[in-house]
Design a protein with these regions (language model features):
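N-terminal core-binding DNA-recognition domain of tyrosine recombinases/integrases
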Residues: 36-55, 59-141, 173
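Active-site/catalytic core of tyrosine-dependent DNA strand-transfer enzymes
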Residues: 242-304
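Flexible interdomain linker/hinge and immediately adjacent N-terminus
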Residues: 122-168
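Short, basic (Lys/Arg/His-rich) helix/loop patches that form interaction surfaces
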Residues: 283-284, 288-337
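C-terminal secondary-structure termini that scaffold catalytic or DNA-interacting sites
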Residues: 2, 365-382
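Basic, Lys/Arg- and aromatic-enriched nucleic-acid-binding interface segment
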Residues: 164-197
Length: 382
């Protein structure tokens, strides 16, 4: 079994698609079923736009179909025992559990596609319902009623006490119900930058980067200088803030904050405060107030969320996103430094949480959230 990628001569109705993976067997014959699925993932399905994500799917299917070929098995004539043997063979070769689970996820998605398209009549594995907060394996299906998932029974347990986080659609649904605009901005800082609730409520306006002169689409560094703005353990670090969020924060600071600052001065008889966020009455935002806001939004949206869950959401998605550009250790260190963890061992929990998210969930997720931000452009009037 061999894996190849298309070059710039591969066209579909005149459109060039470079980097589409495809498999050939030892006799250099195309392997139709997985290639049809890889074509679907790369060309047809709109959510998977990254060539790196296509190749990840190709690598996972290459591993599985190589196992089938070496054992003289047909893909449409395997059962759960064959799946278990493949899983255990990867462990024997030293593959880490998170990698094994990601491969199980990709191949299970292939079989679901084949079942849907009538290429097979049953799934060669059993599923069980799990909750996102429990240690389970890859994410296969999201139940519309809540955080319930249909997970492959073959998936390996990775770690106890996985962090509770939201999927992108859940987070979007939750954040959209937050009001006023200020609360949505604070939520975005936790969701997109991994700030703690204590860091958001006490954020000093002086650390906010100026988007003027910067190219749209590129993130800006925000230095959380512990001498200026409170951080856990008084540790200085920087976070990368998406350009669209920086613009929104500046709009808030220019259009909404001056009115709140006057209320603050009238109420407290003090000079102007450097706090970026103030309540509608001009008071500093309390942690209890933020918790109450999230509790009400959870009831309204039907998505249970706490401030720390948004931070966990950042950690989980950011680890997977950076894993496409860095080694696993490099991605881990990046997330550790952005989140301000004192040790990589604390950050490692996101490696295991990432098993719950399939790769196409990651593809372009930041751009998707930034589009939501752009739609909130007149937020300061709400």
């Amino acid at each position: 079994m061999r894996l190849f990628l298309t070059d710039n001569t591969f066209k579909v109705h005149g459109q060039v698609y470079t980097g589409v993976p495809f498999l050939v067997d030892d006799e250099m014959a195309l392997v139709n079923a997985p290639n049809d699925y890889l074509f679907y993932v790369s060309v047809v399905r709109g959510r998977t736009a990254s060539a790196k994500t296509w190749q990840t799917y190709g690598n996972h299917l290459y591993e599985f179909f190589g196992f089938l070929e070496s054992n003289d098995l047909r893909w449409d004539n395997v059962n759960q025992t064959h799946f278990a043997a493949w899983r255990d063979s990867m462990l024997t070769r030293g593959c880490v559990r998170s990698t094994v689970n990601q491969r199980l996820s990709a191949v299970s998605n292939f079989y679901r596609w084949a079942l849907r398209d009538g290429l097979t009549h049953n799934l060669p594995f059993q599923t069980q319902e799990v909750w996102i907060a429990k240690p389970a394996g890859f994410l296969a299906h999201v139940d519309a009623k809540g955080n319930r998932f249909q997970a492959n029974e073959l998936t390996l347990r990775t770690a106890k006490g996985l962090p509770r986080f939201l999927l992108t659609e859940q987070a979007k649904q939750f954040v959209a119900t937050l009001s006023p605009w200020r609360n949505r901005l604070m939520a975005y800082l936790m969701w997109l930058c991994g700030l703690r609730r204590e860091e958001v409520t006490a954020l000093n306006m002086r650390v906010l980067p100026n988007p003027s002169g910067h190219a749209p689409g590129k993130g800006l560094r925000m230095m959380l200088d512990a001498k200026i703005t409170p951080t856990k353990g008084s540790k200085t670090r920087w976070v990368l803030v998406p350009y669209d969020l920086v613009v929104q924060l500046w709009d808030y600071m220019v259009f909404e904050r001056p009115r709140l600052t006057k209320l603050y001065q009238n109420k407290h008889g003090k000079d102007e405060t450097d706090l970026l966020f103030l309540t509608e009455y001009g008071n500093p935002i309390s942690l209890e107030g933020m918790n109450n806001t999230f509790r009400k939004a959870s009831e309204k949206s039907g998505v249970k969320c706490t401030p720390h869950m948004l931070r966990h959401t950042f950690g989980t998605y950011e680890f997977l996103r950076m894993s496409e550009h860095k080694s696993s250790d490099g991605a881990l260190h990046w997330v550790r430094d952005r989140m301000g963890h004192s040790s990589s061992s604390i950050t490692e929990v996101y490696i295991h949480a990432a098993d719950l998210v399939s790769h196409d969930e990651i593809d372009g997720y930041q751009a998707e959230i930034c589009e939501l931000l752009k739609g909130d452009v007149n937020g300061y009037s709400s």
